[in-house]
Amino acid sequence: MYKTNIVFNVLALALFSIFFASCTDMKDESDRGAHSERGALWFGPRLGKRSMKPSTEDNRQTFLRLLEAADALKFYYDQLPYERQADEPETKVTKKIIFTPKLGRSVAKPQTHESLEFIPRLGRRLSEDMPATPADQEMYQPDPEEMESRTRYFSPRLGRTMSFSPRLGRELSYDYPTKYRVARSVNKTMDN
């Protein structure tokens, strides 16, 4: 008797789940999907999820069409003039590989430094007698006079020197123009 009761309960549960799975018109009219009172329990379609649609044509037909298109593409490629066709890749190594320590530079090529116009910051140009790249000793050895003056007055942040440079492209200029131009406001505001 106990076994028949368990079988009956399992059967009733299966019928109940099949009934509710197949019944789609039981949706309440006031139910608005994710915006309902039970929004977290909405099991509607997920946005952006692709549905698995059964393919309408056989995969063999698709594969045959793809092969046919590739054959047509090769036919038209062979019709091109020889200059426009890509060369076939070489299968054998015919050149001796020369070791180059840095990209783009070979060992046999003499290194010459061309004088390029280098602008380190906007609005600033280097003078002709100043080299474009200073030597390492000049870069990493601070000026002794500058070090003494810095320690005497204040200690700026790391990497800062006492020579202050204003905003990029600007020089400190305290020459004010002699004539000023005064214009009226466009939006008709009045000063009281």
Curated annotation (Swiss-Prot):
GO BP: neuropeptide signaling pathway; pheromone biosynthetic process
UniProt propeptide residues: 51-94, 171-192
Span of the signal peptide: 1-23
Tissue expression profile of the protein: Expression is restricted to the subesophageal ganglion.
InterPro entries: PBAN, Pyrokinin_CS
Result, substituting K109N: In strain: J106
Keyword Signal: yes
Keyword vocabulary terms for this entry: Amidation, Cleavage on pair of basic residues, Hormone, Neuropeptide, Secreted, Signal
Keyword Signal appears in the UniProt entry: yes
Gene Ontology molecular-function annotations: myostimulatory hormone activity; neuropeptide hormone activity
Modified residues (Leucine amide): L47, L103, L122, L158, L168
Localization terms from the record: Secreted
Assigned GO CC terms: extracellular region
Pfam family, one: PBAN
Domain of life: Eukaryota
Function: A hormone that controls sex pheromone production in females and pheromone responsiveness in male. Also mediates visceral muscle contractile activity (myotropic activity). Identical to MRCH which is implicated in the formation of both melanin in the cuticle and ommochrome in the epidermis of armyworm species.
Entry similarity comment: Belongs to the pyrokinin family.
Protein name from the UniProt record: PBAN-type neuropeptides
Organism in which the protein naturally occurs: Bombyx mori (Silk moth)
Upper taxonomic lineage: Eukaryota, Metazoa, Ecdysozoa, Arthropoda, Hexapoda
